[in-house]
Amino acid sequence: TSKADYKKGGASTRSAVVRLSNAISLEPYQSDLEFLTNMGLAQRQNLENGIAQSEIHRSYYSYTISIDLDRIGVDVEIEVSQEEKASRVKELLDTVQYLYRDIRGRRENLSPLFIIGGRYKRKNPFFENIVSVKANKIGVATLKEIVEDSEELKEYTYTGITSGIFDNEKDVKEKLKAESVGNVFKHLKEEVDAYYEGN
């Protein structure tokens, strides 16, 4: 807490156990317009319909999620079981794997088309701001260099790609040993179980 517990105005603060970077567009901004009507509002107010517009942008986005496994389920006075910690992390991984959002009456799929990461001793977001896409091709050389710079990264990094999306899919599979995105999430969950069974 920022003040002693017995003093008024104290606020509980702690650094995040799960960190999410900003989602960064990997392509230049290209907008289009969607024309809408405000028919519902107009009918309720006995007004004329007006045309509204909203911007539409389609792009690949990159973001990084870092999870401090040591701190999951741990607070000042309580600590949940290892099984509960593993369950919480695996639920988060399931959420990311099937991520979507509902907006303006439609559902948008936000699940990953490409994923790279693993469980590492160093608590470092190794791949943050590293993934790039140019001409619908994932920048393999930089990712390969980072993975090969460390024995730990070589051994514990998993790469997944969704088939039929990127033009250099074969290159990604060969050079980064990529498999399906679903298999990567399966491996990550196995790593979570192994971590909590060993601690």
Residue ranges of predicted features:
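Basic polyanion-binding and macromolecular-assembly surfaces
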Residues: 1-199
